[in-house]
C-alpha cells in the first residue's frame, strides 16, 4: 500500500521531532551534568554524529522510495537535508565557540590549514550551505538543469563527512567505521550518479592542470 499525502505530512511531523528532540536532550544534558568528563568534545561529537545521521537518512530516501515503490517519500528528502545542515551548523558553531572561543575565532583559518580533517569538515559544510540555500522550488526553477548538478555534490559530502569523523577521533572505535560503511553502501546504491559527479570533477581538475 502506498503512502498518502496525509501520511507523508504526519511523517514530516515525526521527522521534525526527530530533528528537534536531540537538541532538547543536548540542552538538558548541558544543564544537568549529562555529559562526560570533556563536555566540549561530547557536544562536538553529538552534533556531528546527528548531522551525519540526517545526511545518511537523506541519501536513503531516493533508493527507499524506488525499491519500496513509495514515490511520495521523496517529499521528505528536503526536510531531512535541512535538518542535516542545521545540525552541521551546530557542529561548526560548537567548535568555533567552545573549542576556539569567541576571542580566538581569527585562529579558525590557521586551524583549517594545520588540521586537514577540519578542512574536510568546512568543505562539507559549505556544500551543505549551498544545497540548503538552493533547496526551494523557486531556486530549482531558476537554476534549471544546473540545480541537479549542484545537488549531486551531496555525494561528495557523503565521502568527506565520514572521513572527517574518522580523522577527528583519537582512538578508532566501531562507531565512525559503521557510519563510513553505511555511507559507502548508500553511495553504491546511487552508483551512477556518484560516478557521474566524480568523473565531472576529475575532468575539471584535469582541464585546470592542463591550462
Swiss-Prot record:
Keyword list, A-Z: Cell inner membrane, Cell membrane, Electron transport, Flavoprotein, FMN, Heme, Iron, Membrane, Metal-binding, Transmembrane, Transmembrane helix, Transport
Listed InterPro entries: Fe3_Rdtase_TM_dom, MsrQ-like
Intracellular or extracellular location(s): Cell inner membrane
UniProt record, GO biological process: protein repair
Cofactor binding annotation: Binds 1 FMN per subunit.
Principal localisation: membrane
Keyword Transmembrane helix: yes
Family: Belongs to the MsrQ family.
Function: Part of the MsrPQ system that repairs oxidized periplasmic proteins containing methionine sulfoxide residues (Met-O), using respiratory chain electrons. Thus protects these proteins from oxidative-stress damage caused by reactive species of oxygen and chlorine generated by the host defense mechanisms. MsrPQ is essential for the maintenance of envelope integrity under bleach stress, rescuing a wide series of structurally unrelated periplasmic proteins from methionine oxidation, including the primary periplasmic chaperone SurA and the lipoprotein Pal.
Quaternary structure annotation from Swiss-Prot or TrEMBL: Heterodimer of a catalytic subunit (MsrP) and a heme-binding subunit (MsrQ).
Protein's recorded name: Protein-methionine-sulfoxide reductase heme-binding subunit MsrQ
